[in-house]
């Protein structure tokens, strides 16, 4: 597995933060690094496989990667990212309490993926632009200013995550996307789901396609296929059981869709493991 080292990304040993733009981000194999990373999705779509678990990416996704996590990007489609790198939450000279504004693992569950709305993405652009420039010098005042901008960015993201589920159409769409991520195996009737999240059905179709580049049904099918691939790799369940566990009513139809998506059958994938 590829290991990325801080010496290759930070401008100096004293630099607390580095910015790496990916415009666009192509598929990138599984890797980990000796620093922390905040991945901000500005445009496009793709799949982020984080510690073996697949997550679909779209505009407004924010992913928090620790120094012991492993991840990769695949199925990218005009995926524009800004990566904010920092050495560790406790590695700043003048900041304390950074961990308060980062995801915190609870009972073995790490909420690595957040969402923020378009307004927050616009608000943080100037902060990212400031962070792109290394501190003017190694003087303490320049390091302190640079770190303070990073804290502003972190607070903006944290506030944006807390408020993105607001009572407007964009917030309700984000709630729906999160619901699909966690309930992909359930039978979905789109008119009922639209009512549940107080979205007109046509608005749901239009906005979901704008966010993900896919129709709602295509998006759900892809979620299910990604989860099925994960189970094929990491569980002992049979192909038939996995098909039903991931929301497919027919294992033959599942195999057809799987081969179309990944260019190999479920059994062929299993045989390679």
From Swiss-Prot:
CDD domains: cupin_RhaR_RhaS-like_N
SMART domains in the cross-refs: HTH_ARAC
Gene3D superfamilies with a match to the protein in the record: Homeodomain-like, Jelly Rolls
Keywords in alphabetical order: Activator, Cytoplasm, DNA-binding, Repeat, Rhamnose metabolism, Transcription, Transcription regulation
Any GO BP annotation: positive regulation of DNA-templated transcription
One GO molecular-function entry: DNA-binding transcription factor activity
Highest taxon, organism lineage: Bacteria
DNA-binding region(s) in UniProt: 191-212, 239-262
Domain HTH araC/xylS-type: 174-272
Annotated compartments: Cytoplasm
Keyword Transcription: yes
Pfam family, one: AraC_binding
Role played: Activates expression of the rhaBAD and rhaT operons.
PANTHER family, per database record: HTH-TYPE TRANSCRIPTIONAL ACTIVATOR RHAS, HTH-TYPE TRANSCRIPTIONAL ACTIVATOR RHAS-RELATED
NCBIfam families in alphabetical order: PRK13503.1
Protein name in the entry: HTH-type transcriptional activator RhaS
Organism of this sequence: Yersinia pestis (strain Pestoides F)
